[in-house]
C-alpha cells in the first residue's frame, strides 16, 4: 500500500479550492481498497445496519414570515418563492425590489421607472391625463392662476417683445383674451409674478402692474429702473409677506433688492428707494433666481459662478426688514435655480442637479436634505396642491419635458420623499419656467420654445408604462421563473402589455386584451427559457379604444420562481476500521494499533475543517470534493484477552462542495 499525492488528471472534474489547501489523492498500487478519504484508504463496511447513502442536501431553509404584514412568504405547499406588489403609492426610484439600502417596508410599494401612470392611489395603478398645447411661444413664457369674480383663469406672460399678446387670459373652457399687447409693453419681459391678484412684470427699465381686482383693469407702470438696466436672466420677483420683493443685477454688475409697495400714481424711480440691507454687497453680477417665503421669513436666492445660496430676511412688528443673512449654501457645482415655499414649513429647492426639500424652523432658518431626484437640465419651476408638489423638468419624462410629482406626506428612509413622473409635453423638450394649478387641480405649465401646455379635464394619455425593480429574492443564485399573476378590475377597460426587461432588451410576454374578465396567470417559459438570478417586468397600460376618459387599471401582480442552486450531496460512508482486515482480493492487511491510527488520522482531517477529496473506487474512483460533517465510530465487539482488539465501523457523513 502506498499513499501518495498527485494533481488531478486533465480529464477529471476541475477542483476549485479558494482556501489554497492541497487535498490528498490515493493511488491503488497493491491492496484493493474501496474508498479513500483525504488520501486515507478504507474497506467499505456496508451492512444492513450501516448502509451507504447518497442523497440531495437540503437547499431550502425553513423560513418564518416575520414581515410587518405576514403574507406570501408564509405560504406553503407549492414550493414557489413569490414576490408581489399590490400598490405603488411610494413612487419610483428603486433599482432592486429587495433593497440593498433603505426600508423594505417602503421598497415593496415602489418601482424603478415609469411614464404616463398615476401610482398615488393606494392599491391602484392607472393612467394620467393627457396635456395639450394651447398657446405656442417661441421663447420663454410664464403662467399663473387667478380667480376673478369666482371664475378661474390662467394668465400667460410672453417674454419676447415680438409676441403680439404679451399677457393672455385663458378660461377653464379655453376662451382666450389678450389683456396686454406688444404696443403697451415693448421691451423683453425679464420676470413676472402674481400676488394679491396683481400681476407684476419686470422689463429692463420698468416694473409694470396689472390688477385683476380693479374695476377697469389696465397695465400700469409702478416703477422705473432708472440706473443701469436690469440684466437678462438675473431678475427674481415674488409676492412675500404681503408685498412684492424684487432682486436683480444690472448690466453693469451691481446687485440690489427692494420691497415694492403697490403704486397707483406716477412711476417711482428705483433710485429713490432703500435697498434691503445686504443686497448691494453680493458678488458682482450675482444671478438672482428666486424669492419665496415661509411662516417666519422670506428668502432671496441665486448663484455666483457654481455656488448656489439663499438669504433670509425677517419682518418685525413695524414692518421693517432685517439684514440679509445667508441660510442656504449648496454643495459646490450646484446652482440654485428656484425656490418655492409651501405650507410655511417647507421650501422646495430647484437646483442645477435636481430637487431638494428644505425644512424651516421657528426662527426661519433652513436645513435641506439630499436630492429627491436628479435632473440633469435643472429645475426652474414648482406648484403645489394638498401634500403634493410638482416640479418642471426638461427632457426628464421619457426624454420629454414634463412634471415630476413629489409627495411631502411620504418621507422615505433615505431622507428623501416619494416621487414619480407626471404630466408630459409630448415630443417636446425645453425648460419649464412656470407651473400653475387651476380649475380644481388641473395643471398648466410653460415650456421654453414651445408654449403653454394644459392638462386635459377628462381625457387620458394613450398609454403609460412602469418597470419593476429587479427581483432577486435576496440571493444571486439562479431561479426558474415560472408564473406571473396579474390583478385588475373585473372588466379590463384597456389593453395591458407585459414584457420581461433585461439590460439590453424587453421581451414581450403577452397582451391582455381590453374587455377581458378573467383573472390572469401566465407561464413565464416563453421569456425565461433558461434559469436566471433575477427578473424585472414592464407593464404597459393602454387607454380604452372607444372612450378616451377611461383605460386599463392594475391592482397588483405577483411573480413566482423556484430556487435552482447547484445541488450538493450528503454522502454517508460506512468504513471498516479494524486492526486486521482483508481486501476484496483476499489480501490480509493491518497490524495491532492499525485501527486506532487510521481513526485518529481521519479525525485529524475532520478537525482541520478543510475540504477533502473522497474517492470511491467501487464507482470508478472519480474524486469528489467534500467537507466532513460528522464522524461516528461504532464498536460492537469486546476486546480480546489481551484487552486490545480495538476496532469497529466508522460512519463518515460528508457534504459535497458545489
Regions found by a protein language model. Name each.
Residues 2-182, 198, 205-213, 236-239, ...:
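N-terminal beta-propeller domains
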Residues 5-11, 16, 33, 38, ...:
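Non-cytosolic beta-sandwich-type ligand-binding/adhesion modules
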Residues 134-151, 183-197, 225-242, 279-295, ...:
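Repeated scaffold domains used in trafficking and secretory/extracellular systems
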Residues 177-182, 218-226, 268-279, 321-329, ...:
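Beta-propeller fold detector
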Residues 325-326, 432-437, 519-529:
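Exposed aromatic-hydrophobic patches
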Residues 335-356, 372-412, 474, 483:
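Loop/turn-rich, solvent-exposed surfaces of beta-rich toroidal or solenoidal domains
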Residues 430-467:
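Blade-level signature of beta-propeller repeat domains, shared across WD40, Kelch, NHL, RCC1
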Residues 562-658:
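Extracellular/virion structural assembly segments
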